[in-house]
Amino acid sequence: MVAGTAWLLLFCSCRSQKPGSVDQGAHYLADSNPERVKTILFATIAPDFLYERADFFAQNGIHGFMMAHIMASWQDDIWKQPTAYTPHAPAGRVVGEANPLLRKCRRTNQRCRELGIEYNSVKVAFYKNLPDWFDDAAWRALCENFHQCAVFSRLAQFSGITLDIEYIAEMYHLDYPAYQVAGYPRDRLRSQAQQRGQELMAAMIKGFPDMIFWLLPECMTMYGPLASDLFSGMVSALAEKDSPGGIHVCSEGTYTATKPRALFGLVYKTDIKSQQVLAASADQQALEYWRRRGSISPGLWPLGYYREILDAAGNRIGYAGKKEKFGDRIIGSYADKSENYSAAEFQRQYAAGRLLARRFVWIYCHGQVFWQLSKEEMIRFHASAGDTLPVVDNLQDYLDVLRYPKILQDSSFANGSRLVREHQGLNYFTGFAPYWRHLGPFAFDQKNFSMPMAPEKTIDLQAEYTTLSGQGCWQKTPVDSSGYVDLASLYGNQKMPLAYSLAWVASAKKQPVQLGFGCNDCATVFVNGKSVFHFDGSRNAVIDEDIIAVTLPAGRSQILVKCGDRGGSHWGFYLRILEQAEKNKVRWVEP
């Protein structure tokens, strides 16, 4: 069967197929207010294709697209012709109504709006390093590019702009090599990044005052402090104009979080950190704007699979797909549209995400995972070879999740989600230690995290140890209101280190107690010298991802956490006494 015929059959089947239960173990309710939350796809989709097949997406619960390759990166001129979607246009810069890409996009957006797809946006990325923060001329040029993008988006009847700031993560850290040059004004760096965020957003608002703005990923929890400063500057500019479209932070840490508790913890963490960043900026107007018009949009990644292929030295040499389909053959990052998790897991994730979302849930499409074109269609629509690759056999199961939206039948989860999406969840979790004592950082064998080191053999608060930073001893530090023990902030960027954290609890009697734990990345938890939990992988830290059952003796007990980093921008953990234990008179104490 040719791809175009298969696509037509899929299209027809979507009109008649009835919803079915995709997860017999979960309990769902039909969403009684399905219009409250809109579903958006992040996708490379040709405008001509979307124009012709918009009814298919509308019928399957899609409300918008973050459209890539209209303006790829910050340094691009959106008016320049030709483009991938207008390959036959004469070369040159065509500004305004005569621009062929603008006309094409406007026609598509008008068609989409007629069918209820109202939230298309131009997706722009920081694919190239930004200019130096203090280069005024270069930043004026950058802001002008974004201003023109906003003008184009407004004239083409997009609903707004999506900005992806992911690809220059190293620039957001204060130890970036360019900032270490003698004479560089490092003391002004953070305020300058905030100012650039204001300028960037002001340029877009000037061109498109009513735009909706999506920002991805959750930079305040994923990157260094300059990303948070950029974010706070953007919110300040939006708040100054009380821009009606709002700012919507699109989370990526939630991509494969199919368990509701994990999804809840990640969205909660992002919102609390966002409020902390804005409060620290001392711009009360920005914080109030966030609470009125800001939101976290949970990101999901059900389809589109890839894995790295490494050489003997551990260097990446390419990407493969599912091993059972492609073995270790290098096929490219976007060549396998297979599932990352089942339709049943997607149903559960989407049902939880709808409760947590204030306005939007977004789905990352790693490749053109929800459609397949024939080669003739690819040419006609000016699409790409990826559009012609086969979709999963049970695509309809995934589409039905979107077409017939459900929410979890769990009143406790629903009530907690409402607090989080309304930015009122600050004290939702309790039982965190007010202080921890930390020792580190230490180097460790990534293949042997379990190997005992001196601090876990004997606890001596007065002893000195040789660490990666020189001689060190136990240091007492407070825990912020989110409960996250941020070892990366405490120790700075190290090369995949580990550290020890120490605290004490007191129990009124001998009793069973539950501890909620979550770590980034690997960790062992010891209670009174005995290992009660061990995880030797890589993951995001999520509140209560693991529930650790222990029996505490009457009196004082020692809790030691050994936490290791396996790369990335984050390293730390959550550990708390669960509520029932608090009622039974278990509390944090000093030694």
Predicted ranges, named:
Residues V2-L10:
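Bacterial N-terminal signal peptides
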Residues L10-A26:
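Bacterial Sec-dependent signal peptides at the C-terminal "C-region" and cleavage site
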Residues S21-L419:
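Glycan-processing catalytic domains of CAZymes
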Residues N415-L487, V561-P591:
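Accessory carbohydrate-binding/adhesion or oligomerization-edge regions at the termini
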Residues S489-A499, D536-A541:
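Extracellular beta-rich ligand/substrate-recognition surface
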Residues S501-V513, A549-A554:
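Extracellular and analogous surface-interaction loops
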Residues S507, Q511-F526, I559:
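Aromatic-lined ligand-binding clefts that engage carbohydrates, nucleic acids, or primary amines
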Residues V527-Y574:
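Beta-strand-rich ligand-recognition modules
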